Amino acid sequence: MKKIWALAATVLLLLGTLLVGCSQESKATPKDILIEAYGKSTEITSAKFEGSIKLNLGLPDSVIQEDPSTAMVLNMLNNAALSFRGTTQLDPALTELFLTILVTGDTEIAIHLPILAIEDKMWVKIPNTPFLPLPDDSIGKYLELDFAELSEMSGQEITNPSPEQQQQYQQLGKEIAELFFGAFDENTYFSKESKEDAGIPDDVNTDQVVKFELTDDNFRPFIESLYVVLPALIDKVAEIKEAGLTQAEVEEFKAELQASEQDLDATLDELEQNMTIHKASTVTAVDKNGFVAYTGLEVDLAITSEGETGRIGLQAAFKQSEINEKVEFELQQPDASEVIKFQELMSLILYGL
């Protein structure tokens, strides 16, 4: 059962990596369009963006009955939705992000988190919410997070990626996309879609839409191909400093992967018997300049074990606009009177206990 849920979660996460992309000419194949998308993304220096994420999880009755707290957490997750919007530019490094967590049910609660980040600092506006009973003196102020101070306190380096680092990560994203998409058969997983059939919102201007889809029929070859390309993918991920992977950990992962390969057929047999893919696809819409305008992800898996069935569902969307234009920001760096330092907030919390 653990193998089934772990592998299903892995598939879910890998599909999530497809929430980025771009394209080029209409003559290109669908796979070529997605591979070129990451190459084009290295050219992005500024943009507006927005998106949303919604989970839908259903655990077997026996799991919920054994642990009532699990049912409470599950209910909260299923009644919650995350949405976000923001603006970003590389040079000078500046990003603003407006996060909203909406929890519905008997009572609707919305938590809003405005965030502003520059190269060496970040400010988060402290919300007034029953989920976080914070001191009254801190409500409405901006919590200042100085990356150098946090690094000293934690003993680990904490930084906001510089423009050069962000461009490096964009390049790595392109290389990872080439490896990932290149591992899969063109006709089995990729297709061009119309804007209407793909469910792209009306306000998205797009010339091309590409769909990447997993089904019960192509799931086995997907995992088999993934096993082949995973070592190279891990090498690329290890190049990202923030991933924190040492060479020893990379080699250990590769060894474990190789050792588990002998059990792969049996694991896939078990999955094919116990997992149903109702839907697992991502659609990427590309604008006239070859940049991603919209990406949508939808996953719905049913997993059965010992006569009980659970569900894993995820809907996500990401949209960007005003790419490489002169973008306007809504937030400004807060004045000293509006700021509370991290240590000050900790002191207020401890004093109030």
Where are these regions (language model features)?
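Subset-of-secretome marker
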Residues: 23-353
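Bacterial N-terminal signal peptides that target proteins for export
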Residues: 1-9
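C-terminal motif of bacterial Sec signal peptides marking the signal peptidase cleavage site
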Residues: 18-21
